[in-house]
């Protein structure tokens, strides 16, 4: 069954490219979400609109589970860093998982609660309902496919073999 999740892990270029390489992921789009209004532009996001850079991930949950997506997500973020991932700083780089689906939010919330319990401390991962979505400008879509030497704070090769697309 196809499902949709919005994944925020800092700059969306690396998040998008990372999940494009994961089996079961069918489509990705760089977006700005949950800033209170639609139609935002990159310049406004950089100037503090409160939107978060996120990647809409469409996946087949018969090929990759939510638990697997969670494990992979934890490989690419620092869950204890507020509004900063890699060299990127600002509220647009906060981390979280967002959805329209209440059951999906509950599942990820439970996974995060178990993670915090196992770590013995709180983290900054938001698990929230999607309120508003604006597709990022075309030059942001597939950025690291078009700019193979472009900036990325994520190790794009850090995908365990069992999760890699063939």
Curated annotation (Swiss-Prot):
UniProt cross-references to SUPFAM superfamilies, sorted A to Z: Peptide methionine sulfoxide reductase
Catalytic activity of the protein: L-methionyl-[protein] + [thioredoxin]-disulfide + H2O = L-methionyl-(S)-S-oxide-[protein] + [thioredoxin]-dithiol; [thioredoxin]-disulfide + L-methionine + H2O = L-methionine (S)-S-oxide + [thioredoxin]-dithiol
GO cellular component assignments: cytoplasm
Entry keyword annotation includes Oxidoreductase: yes
Function summary: Has an important function as a repair enzyme for proteins that have been inactivated by oxidation. Catalyzes the reversible oxidation-reduction of methionine sulfoxide in proteins to methionine.
Family recorded in the similarity comment: Belongs to the MsrA Met sulfoxide reductase family.
Protein name: Peptide methionine sulfoxide reductase MsrA
Lineage per the UniProt record: Bacteria, Bacillati, Mycoplasmatota, Mycoplasmoidales, Metamycoplasmataceae
């Amino acid at each position: 069954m196809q499902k949709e999740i919005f994944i925020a892990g800092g700059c969306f270029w690396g998040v998008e490219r990372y999940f494009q390489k994961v089996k079961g992921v069918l489509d990705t789009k760089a977006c700005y979400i949950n800033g209170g209004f639609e139609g935002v532009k990159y310049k406004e996001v950089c100037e503090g609109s409160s939107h978060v850079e996120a990647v809409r991930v469409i996946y087949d949950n018969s090929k990759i589970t939510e638990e697997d997506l969670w494990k992979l997500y934890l490989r690419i973020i620092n869950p204890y860093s507020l509004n900063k991932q890699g060299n990127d700083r600002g509220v647009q780089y906060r981390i979280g998982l967002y959805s329209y689906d209440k059951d999906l939010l509950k599942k990820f919330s439970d996974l995060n609660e178990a993670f915090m319990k196992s770590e013995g401390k709180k983290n900054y991962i938001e698990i929230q309902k999607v309120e508003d979505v604006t597709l990022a400008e075309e030059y942001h879509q597939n950025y690291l496919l078009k700019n193979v030497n472009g900036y990325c704070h994520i190790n794009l090769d850090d995908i365990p073999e069992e999760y890699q697309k063939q």
